[in-house]
């Protein structure tokens, strides 16, 4: 009976005999069996026991990370740690899965000897820091093993992403991600008993299998991505290959890290990772050939993806996806279609896979084969004093029944921190290895290479030797350290004690090697039934022997392959044959890796050769010889390849060898004979694997294409929140360090304050119901006196109304008016009001009510907002008169007598008072919102300290005494329609005339009260006023208004925009974006108000004079000179402050002067995502009040930014907007469709709209003094030679084809243009100039990018315009100085002045200034005799033009001329003036402090807007290509040539008679 005290998490022992009785004893050994204690200091080790040989394998402990850091599938950015919740769930699962026997870990191993059965009992004690021990098998599992029932363990996914094992005894239900047709599955584990031998093995993380032919264990890599429940603590990291082969239907073929091939043999037990029993196991167990009747439970609900869907994928996406798959996956996809086959044949894809596999399967102590050739070799002195004892490794003492093993002293190199460490090996160890691989070939190779095996090599830092977890070694390595003993006794019980100590070999720079020899004591007890034997001490160190053997093999292979693959000489055929015959004794993975390393020749080797010679003399010879060796190794029948070796070989062949070459074909044929890899369909990839793949796709295009492949892929992308992750990744790229979130800025209002404020100004639903009831009662009370009045009016139709008589004022006209008011009260003219007369609409900024007595933000009083013209007259009657309804934007002015009493900030009382009876006051009702846009909270000053909420209480005082009636206003007869039915009686009716146009409702009666206001004045009147209306003149800004309504006159704290309610109430911007009309004034009864743009005065006969209401100036309205970025974005998207559209446009047009585009976009996205307040009452209420209005504001800014500044977007911003508009933005928002449409339009026209800058540049100016020379003309003006002169001379003209010296051209071309009419020349010059001017972007004028050489690329069009200006200037000088005769020069100057005159008539001031600058150049200005020859008419033209473009008075004459140009007329302004103004505005010396200056932005915007207006009006001249081409290639001379020729034409102190 074997008992194992297992404190390790990764110990597996396979079982080869039927299990007997199992006892549940902890740390108690059976007295009938001997105890073998194995002490292992490594926490994570895998030990396989076979015939007394113990081969522990050290693996790297990587903590409790979920994903493997070295797994290319789950990259480092996806790796994380277990959360406490995950650990709690894992512990709970362990408790449920384990019975009372918590520490039962019993396995039984039986071994067959020659005479009797020998029982080897191994008690393995592993040092582990964890105090808890967990069983390898639960009670239910053990009972199932003993009973022979099959157990299927299925991994179930828990919310934390871990996997746990649950036992199922039925095979009917299968997970959708599993497939029964595959042999190995990583998501399900099945432990089956062998039906022939009734043996069962259990697997936790590492599975083993026994091969009788080799008497060794087959170690496989773990297949579970996370530790099973049997682990006490999740300290195990998943295997690399297992994590990558996570799919439920992935075929896993012998995932052992060493050379184990599954060969058919008798009495063989294989514990593999199958999900179901199926007939495919026959490849691994030929004794089970009769098990073909096993049913497959493949899930047929998942159908393979059609080939056509894959054809829709892009090649780049293919390569990205395939880069995360293994070779078997690619081989399966390779057979899908020719298109995929061509893509998979991409060698770069396989090269990447090859590098991944090398990293995974390479040993950390691997020695690079080219190190000895590339780096200097240090001599070392091997001081081994135990060589004499090492030659007796295989000698057995058979006579005395004593085993004497003298193990080799191997120097292990574990000093990873020492740059000079290496793995040394003694001569005796070479002899031991030679003996183990055979006396014929192995010994000869060892003897020949003995002198080269102990050469120390510097540790290399190449990528293919990155330290990875050490995989288990193959059987041959175990055999090197096993003791071949012959047992003559009947019963032998071996007791092996292993001390795992690693000896490091440190090589000093001087080359001295210090060998630390380990003394390991092992005792073997031989007990006989008749007598007891003696104990013999053995020197054994398995760990050192394993590493030493590996390093020895490494060194031997390096030397052998260097000898067999030289560059010039030919290796011996006999030696090569001996090596091939014995190569199966080397680890197969190590052998293949060395051959591949040798094939990839580094360029540093023989670097003195040229590339061609190096390929011919070095690379190709070595590669051909390596290819031949590789083919022979593959064809060697004794060499068995494991899974990792096959991956390395296949990826290497596909990546580095041409598929059509004979070498590639031969290697592929050899691999097909060796072993066939089974593959799975890509459509069956599990959802977890799909999500892991998709998370590595960092492009919206890749995810979008994958989303359209199949419904399953679409679902995987949808449920994994990949779009949100991609959205956040893009935003992280725009984020700047040190940036404060806009919602965390203490200088701004918090969301809680905003919500509380809107909660105060909006009544609760109960109050709104009361308001509805009060409104209905009011309507009923209004109808009763109106009926009585109608009866009395029938008897008094012919009586004129007296001034003080209030009983005889009704007539037919008034009756019609009252009927119309009643219809408005009943809501008969409204769409949503119905016949009930009242319609409630909650405060929804996006859906205002239009019906009845509307309550809502867009309800316009009792009439719902419809305007009516009565009797064909021009007098407008507002629908809210007499209605009593109110809304957030309701209009309360009307034509009939209305008494209004304000009791609370949100209470408005209205009443219709008939003229024929006494005054009747209607009951008060409460309005849901104060009917004015000034109800919005005032802006707080942008200071670090947040101000407290402002009070909105309104107190009323007693009304003043009634004033006398003012003088009667008479209306001209022409103002009334002759067809009106009540024109004669209209004088008894008081009708208000709105001060705004008839298409715009009048302003509201209430405005916001300042915080410091404690009382207001309210006047009430019940008298009847007889007045007439006055016509509204379009040319007069002053209006006169008489009303009979009771109004509240309040001094506003700021102007609030009026409501431009044109019937469309879905746009939230009407709440705060539209400006109020300062000319509209509400007055008390019997008062005459004269409203103007500056002030309004209120007078009456009783000399009750109220102070004039002054309209505040725009410059004094809430102007914050300096603010930070958060305050600016808050101002642009505020729902509490009315933001002027000019400020928004100015900030968006000039934002690049203080921030970048990425910063602005990121701030707007921060503003869009509003953190939810903690004091909200309901989600719907929160969205309606705060979230939706702010998001709509942000979307408006986004739309403006996309429409006007899309060229400023980089690739990241464009991708971010794509994700935002497709997957993040609220699709129910009213501006979503507009925003998507604008973005799509810009995106589709991006390539076509960005035209290249026209290749028109000027010659390089060599003028001293910065190129700002000027000369005074005959008219007293002066012209700048280049535009840069206006800016300070910092601009340098660039050299181009126009600026070349035209000496190679024919002389006739100089006269071709001059011979044309001046008018035609001016037209063609204007067309060329406007083509450049129209391409200038607004962003080019910012930050003086045109004047700094480092930022020329930011203003290419301005630079093109400057170069063109300089070219024209030099061309004028060239064509004048070219002529030798004075008369000819005079004609050319006269022609140029005529051209300039025509340019002025075409408003082409830019080219005009260029010609005048050429005439004022020193080379031309000094030709006084030439200028004297000009005619007086031409001299007058020159004087006028020089005066126009003079710089005197800051270009006053030119500015005046430009201001008189018709805005619709085509014009090209002189850019020099604008550049000088922009330079002054953007000068940093004028900056008073840190922050954003809105005033400066407004000034910049005004200039940019002017330029944009000029760009909108192109010229309509006919274009002549030949003339245009000639004008584009103007001939110019250099400065030196111009000066030299000028001195030749008119030398100094010459006379006229001396000249021609």
From Swiss-Prot:
Residues 19-63, 93-141, 163-239, 254-296, 385-416, 762-815, 827-1101, 1254-1279 are annotated as: Disordered. Residues 170-186 have a biased composition (Acidic residues). Keywords: Guanine-nucleotide releasing factor, Repeat. Residues 256-271, 911-935, 1059-1076 have a biased composition (Polar residues). Residues 307-353, 679-726 form the F-box domain. Residues 1317-1548 form the Ras-GEF domain. The keyword Nucleus does not apply. Residues 849-866, 1264-1279 have a biased composition (Gly residues). Residues 1116-1244 form the N-terminal Ras-GEF domain. Pfam families: F-box-like, RasGEF, RasGEF_N. The keyword Calcium does not apply. Promotes the exchange of Ras-bound GDP by GTP. This is Ras guanine nucleotide exchange factor G. It comes from Dictyostelium discoideum. The lineage of its organism: Eukaryota, Amoebozoa, Evosea, Eumycetozoa, Dictyostelia.
